[in-house]
Regions:
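Active-site-proximal beta-alpha core segment in soluble small-molecule metabolic enzymes
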Residues: 34-207, 229-232, 237
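A broadly conserved detector of short glycine/acidic/proline-rich loop/turn motifs that flank catalytic sites
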Residues: 17, 136, 180, 214, ...
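Solvent-exposed, flexible loop/coil residues
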Residues: 10, 14-17, 22, 47, ...
């Protein structure tokens, strides 16, 4: 079809460029043994999900409707995080999501039993894997503190002071998301701050999710720095590593 024949308005996607980016992400998965998830709030053109699913491990969502989209259109690993969940939404999320991440221990306590019993209502008969979002209180962003998850008075994630080791039973993963269109050196800085405060708990976990904001496919991205960090984590702690790039 010629450009002049396209119905307008419409979205036009360069499949070759998308595949080039996906190949970079797939190589990272294969070389380092990590898992890449599509952050749907950044890119949710579901007509491309079957193609994207050929290269990466799955999707991550910020609520029920994105979770449905990933479950129905890609059908691979399906993760979700939200600052708070409605009980009605949680009843469906435990059926369609593999990982559910809570913003606080209060939210986890509220839905712990529902997650624990989730195998009874899931097609795969496997219980949901539960995670807690962490605020490592390490800001690497400048100029827009109001949007910074580690900024003053942020309520995104659990700080070291708020962490409840006594409530870790049933928690299988930790998650932090602090970056926005940033390079690997900022991720290293963030992880080092996280490790200093929370690293001891990783020995009790099955996975670590380092969120999104990684410009992995950008030309000047420090890919070798990222690989070195992932290898260090996997060699030091008994956890699977997840990343959630969106724009990349």
């Amino acid at each position: 079809m010629m450009w002049k024949d396209l119905p307008t308005p419409c979205y036009v996607v360069d499949e070759g460029k998308i595949r080039k980016n996906l190949e970079i992400l797939a190589d990272l998965e294969q070389e380092c043994g990590c898992h890449i998830l599509l952050a749907q709030k950044a890119f949710s053109m579901y007509s491309l999900y079957p193609m994207i699913g050929q290269y990466i491990s799955g999707t991550t969502a910020s609520g029920l409707y994105e979770a449905r989209l990933g479950y129905e259109e890609m059908g691979k690993e399906n993760h979700v995080f939200a600052p708070a969940y409605k009980e009605k939404d949680m009843e469906e999320l435990v059926q369609i999501c593999d990982h559910i991440i809570f913003n606080s221990f209060a939210q986890y306590e509220k839905y712990k039993e529902m997650c624990r019993e989730s195998a009874k209502v899931r097609k795969d008969k496997k219980a949901v894997s539960v995670g807690i979002r962490i605020n490592p209180q390490c800001s690497t962003q400048e100029g827009h503190e109001i949007y910074d998850p580690c900024g003053y008075a942020s309520r995104l994630g659990v700080t070291e002071e708020q962490f409840r080791e006594d409530l870790l039973e049933g928690v299988e993963g930790l998650h932090f998301h602090t970056l926005c269109e940033q390079n690997a050196d900022d991720l290293v800085t963030t992880f080092q701050a996280f490790e200093k405060k929370f690293g001891k708990y990783l020995y009790r976990m099955k996975w670590l999710n380092m969120g999104g904001g990684h410009h992995i496919t950008r030309e000047n991205y420090q890919i070798e720095t990222l690989k070195k960090l992932i290898r260090y984590i996997r060699e030091t702690y008994p956890v699977e590593v997840y990343l959630e790039p969106g724009e990349a």
